[in-house]
């Protein structure tokens, strides 16, 4: 969402508009700033170097098109960054995932990254409360030839997960799950996903560094939504660190991604 802890406290609507359209002095915007600086790197130039050198040249045309469509959406800061999409695509291939799940879809950039990495008979159970956003990216997904892999469910994810947990045949049947949704429910999702993801499978939680606010003092000024969800993110990070059912790795990709490998 934002770049650093400083931006978490100081970014305003005019500043966001200025970031999206240049610096106010006629300087042209950098490409990644179209959807905000989704990296915790302090150097904007270094992040741009990563995108220009390793990410954009390898980005599939369908993902590029979806990224550009999403950049025009008023909620574009909700999207997965291009480097994180590349990371997820590689991760799916590395673990040989076939059956996956995504909680929180938005326009489907990370969903498309996953779908492209899955084998032809791979599947994704995708859940989001807003079908309209998903349908914004659906033409790109279909154009990429992977729409048949996606089972989209509109509505809250917890009832869907509870139904899956109630079906013993679904236990341990998923290879991978990616969560980028309501932070106040991350721990609720975690308990259910540990039943549904197979031993050795992975769960990825997005935004676990939460705009850098996780290192700010409690009395630091923050935007309202940052402050509201900050304690939930801190609680998640502490809980995952103490959970012996998983091995964890927290990475400064995008806004922070924590990978959990189920071991119990």
Swiss-Prot record:
Cofactor(s) essential for the protein: a divalent metal cation
Segments of skewed composition (Basic and acidic residues): 28-37
Chain positions recorded as a divalent metal cation binding sites: 180, 206-207
Catalytic activity of the protein: (E)-caffeoyl-CoA + S-adenosyl-L-methionine = (E)-feruloyl-CoA + S-adenosyl-L-homocysteine + H(+)
Pathway(s) it belongs to: Aromatic compound metabolism; phenylpropanoid biosynthesis
Biased composition (Low complexity): 1-20
Record text on cofactor binding: Binds 1 divalent metal cation per subunit.
A single GO BP: lignin biosynthetic process
Single GO term (MF): caffeoyl-CoA O-methyltransferase activity
Residues covered by region (Disordered): 1-37
Enzyme Commission no: 2.1.1.104
Keyword list, A-Z: Lignin biosynthesis, Metal-binding, Methyltransferase, S-adenosyl-L-methionine, Transferase
Pfam families: Methyltransf_3
Binding positions for S-adenosyl-L-methionine per the UniProt entry: 80, 102, 104-105, 110, 128, 157, 182
PROSITE patterns linked: SAM_OMT_I (PS51682)
Binding site for substrate: 38, 180, 211
Described purpose of this protein according to its UniProt entry: Methylates caffeoyl-CoA to feruloyl-CoA and 5-hydroxyferuloyl-CoA to sinapoyl-CoA. Plays a role in the synthesis of feruloylated polysaccharides. Involved in the reinforcement of the plant cell wall. Also involved in the responding to wounding or pathogen challenge by the increased formation of cell wall-bound ferulic acid polymers.
Family, as annotated: Belongs to the class I-like SAM-binding methyltransferase superfamily. Cation-dependent O-methyltransferase family. CCoAMT subfamily.
Name of the protein: Caffeoyl-CoA O-methyltransferase 2
Gene (UniProt): CCOAOMT2
């Amino acid at each position: 969402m934002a770049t650093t802890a400083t931006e978490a406290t100081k970014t305003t609507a005019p500043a966001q508009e200025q970031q999206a359209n240049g610096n106010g002095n006629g300087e042209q915007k950098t490409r990644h700033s179209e959807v905000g600086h989704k990296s915790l790197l302090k150097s904007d130039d270094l992040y741009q170097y990563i995108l220009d050198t390793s990410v954009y040249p390898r980005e599939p045309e369908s993902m590029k098109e979806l990224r550009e469509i999403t950049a025009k959406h008023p909620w574009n800061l909700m999207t997965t960054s291009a480097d994180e999409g590349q990371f997820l695509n590689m991760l799916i291939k590395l673990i040989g995932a076939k059956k996956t799940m995504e909680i929180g879809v938005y326009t489907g950039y990370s969903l498309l990254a996953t779908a492209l990495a899955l084998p032809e008979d791979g599947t994704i159970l995708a859940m989001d409360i807003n079908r309209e956003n998903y349908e914004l990216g659906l033409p790109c997904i279909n154009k990429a030839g992977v729409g048949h892999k996606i089972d989209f469910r509109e509505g809250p994810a917890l009832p869907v997960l509870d139904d899956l947990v109630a079906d013993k045949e679904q236990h341990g049947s998923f290879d991978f799950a990616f969560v980028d949704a309501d932070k106040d429910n991350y721990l609720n999702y975690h308990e259910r996903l540990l039943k549904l993801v197979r031993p050795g499978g992975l769960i990825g939680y997005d935004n676990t560094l939460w705009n850098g606010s996780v290192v700010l003092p409690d009395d630091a000024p923050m935007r309202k939504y940052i402050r509201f969800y900050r304690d939930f993110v801190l609680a998640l990070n502490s809980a995952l660190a103490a959970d012996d059912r998983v091995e964890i790795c927290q990475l400064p990709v995008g806004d922070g991604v924590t990978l959990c490998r189920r071991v119990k």
